[in-house]
Amino acid sequence: MATEIFYDADADLGIIQGRKVAVIGYGSQGHAHALSLRDSGADVRIGLPEGSKSRAKAEEEGLRVLTPAEASAEADLIMILAPDTKQRQIYADDIAPNLKSGDALFFGHGFNIRYGLIKPPSDVDVAMVAPKGPGHLVRRQFVDGKGVPCLIAVEQDASGNAQALALSYAAGIGGARAGVIKTTFTEETETDLFGEQAVLCGGASALVQTGFEVLVEAGYQPEIAYFEVLHELKLIVDLMWEGGIAGQRYSISDTAEYGDLTRGPRVIDAHVKESMRKILAEVQDGTFAKEWVAEDEAGRPNFNKLQDQGNAHQIEEVGKKLRSLMSWTQRP
């Protein structure tokens, strides 16, 4: 099936301009969505708890700030951009009691819908708009007259117009300037979780730590090991990001490329691929979601233990020392 990609010419910005939008949350994505929608002519309000530290920031940026319940009652399109683990409670306490027939419930990630943690009534639209970039980039690109590609999906089309509404919303945050790709809640959620677990976060972190351990255990200086398996990773990832794997290989030495082509498959071998398939299966059948929800509800004991173990790894101490020598790695 051919991928469907939409652009500004395919979107009707007037649709989102005619809605009352509530953005629940004002973190990385929340601020980018709210400010860009406002600048696109939409009627936007923010939903935050009374004690939220983000309330002052949102008000300083000229946005109306209400409680999540008040914002939901006032709006006819509610975008939930709170953390995954908090969405179910926010929905039950503040949104569900204020949902009206014909409203639209939007998400920036499909987790809670895909795994049935939130079950909207049948008379509301349920859709997703997910920019493929962090909030600060979404906002900066919008202000510069550009955009970050977005995914859109429709889970429930009560109005018969949910896709057009999602596309209009995506255009309102600049996504249609770059391209809006149609997907499903299932595809977005499962590929996102798999990517995080097997490659981007879990896979990369474990690969780097294990490579560091192999070098140090073989008698090499930890500082040298850090440079070779962690620090220089950014150089390679940047090359991949700019030109794909082929572009990265074109830019490195022949020696490095030969080692890549002949040794890489020995590290990421058939056994690793089978482990990846098992991880994907746990995402698909809900095993991971059930485990994570139970872990969160129990106070995150295993999460905290594993986090502490990771923070205590030798690579963290070595890295902190070496990064202090490199001013360009320091965040302002």
From Swiss-Prot:
Record's cofactor remark: Binds 2 magnesium ions per subunit.
Gene Ontology terms: cellular component: cytosol
Domain of life: Bacteria
Coiled coil residues, start to end: none
Protein EC: 1.1.1.86
One term of GO molecular function: NADP binding
Active site: 109
Reactions catalysed according to its record: (2R)-2,3-dihydroxy-3-methylbutanoate + NADP(+) = (2S)-2-acetolactate + NADPH + H(+); (2R,3R)-2,3-dihydroxy-3-methylpentanoate + NADP(+) = (S)-2-ethyl-2-hydroxy-3-oxobutanoate + NADPH + H(+)
Cited InterPro entries: 6-PGluconate_DH-like_C_sf (IPR008927), KARI (IPR013023), KARI_C (IPR000506), KARI_N (IPR013116), KARI_prok (IPR014359), NAD(P)-bd_dom_sf (IPR036291)
Binding site for NADP(+): 26-29, 52, 54, 84-87, 135
Sequence positions that bind Mg(2+) 1: 192, 196
SUPFAM superfamilies (UniProt xref): 6-phosphogluconate dehydrogenase C-terminal domain-like, NAD(P)-binding Rossmann-fold domains
Annotated metabolic or biological route of this protein: Amino-acid biosynthesis; L-isoleucine biosynthesis; L-isoleucine from 2-oxobutanoate: step 2/4; Amino-acid biosynthesis; L-valine biosynthesis; L-valine from pyruvate: step 2/4
Domain KARI C-terminal knotted: 184-329
Pfam families the UniProt entry points to: KARI_C (PF01450), KARI_N (PF07991)
The KARI N-terminal Rossmann domain, residue ranges: 3-183
Required co-factors: Mg(2+)
Residues noted as binding Mg(2+) 2 in the record, renumbered to the chain: 192, 228, 232
UniProt KW keywords: Amino-acid biosynthesis, Branched-chain amino acid biosynthesis, Magnesium, Metal-binding, NADP, Oxidoreductase
One Gene Ontology term from the biological process aspect of the record: L-valine biosynthetic process
Residues given in the record as substrate binding sites: 253
Tagged with keyword Transcription: no
Class in the EC hierarchy, top level: oxidoreductase
Function: Involved in the biosynthesis of branched-chain amino acids (BCAA). Catalyzes an alkyl-migration followed by a ketol-acid reduction of (S)-2-acetolactate (S2AL) to yield (R)-2,3-dihydroxy-isovalerate. In the isomerase reaction, S2AL is rearranged via a Mg-dependent methyl migration to produce 3-hydroxy-3-methyl-2-ketobutyrate (HMKB). In the reductase reaction, this 2-ketoacid undergoes a metal-dependent reduction by NADPH to yield (R)-2,3-dihydroxy-isovalerate.
Family of this protein: Belongs to the ketol-acid reductoisomerase family.
Protein name: Ketol-acid reductoisomerase (NADP(+))
